[in-house]
Amino acid sequence: MCCLFGLIDYNNIFTAKEKNRLIKILSTECEARGTDATGIAFNTENGLHISKRPVAAHKMCYRIPDSSKVVMGHTRMTTQGSEKFNFNNHPFPGHVDKLDFALAHNGVLHNDSELRITERLPKTNIQTDSYVAVQLIEKENTLNFDSIKKMAEKTEGSFCYTILDVKNNLFIVKGNNPMAVYKFNGFYLYASTDEILTRAIKKIGLKNYSKINISCGDILKISPNGMIEMQTFEFKDRYYGMFGSGYGYTAYDPYDYESNDIYIGEIAEYASYFGIDPEDVMMLIEYGYDELEIEEMLYDPLEMQKCISEIKLCEMMC
């Protein structure tokens, strides 16, 4: 599980020192969803800059200048494409007609290999599934609601994207993965979950905010002046049934994302990358483990397998 995070300081509330401190605290809280790599994108007078390294957020040294009003960030838990090769880490650079942009993704795409063939996308050394989103936008040669909508409707799987262009427009493209956006007096903060964002806000010492509603199928655009625009796309995931009744656990709707901040469907999907059967994840739910406990187990897959084996042994003996 990865985490998206960021700041839109449209009223120039913060100094460079304050921005760097804020992003440090926010990104460190995001380590709950990924410690393999950390990256940020921001604009200066010289254009779009991306800074990323295969390290946990608390080890990153941020140098965000005073002139940078928007910071888009990502902490990574590796699934596809080694974090040791920095080009696999987020955010990814992109370019359309006279416009640079950066894209970050939380989730797992299932049809990236198919899209590379059917859309005749250029060959690349980047191994992550996420990068096809950049290539699909580049194929349209423009960055706007229409090109983003086309990209979102072609990619299948779990996702939430953030896209920052060189003009300081930030797009949030919400599929079935979580996103929390809070508006303060003169700036916005966002992160993948309310829990992460509220913990960071408390540590930073901020108060008095309102929550921006964003649902699955929404494309939210925040302009450099803080204005919000919203359009929609059709979210579709032909892998919906992967964690549903096919495994025999019909009582739980794994994609009831609006009522769950930590999503069992996504956790089960990530667990499969570590050789853990998604059905076993659902079994843990049946035995009373909550989403956060299961997510924490993924940081020690061997211990998770041990727990699963003990439950199965107990079932056999009963």
Language-model segments: residues:
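Conserved short alpha-helical segments that host acidic/polar catalytic motifs at enzyme active sites
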Residues: 1-318
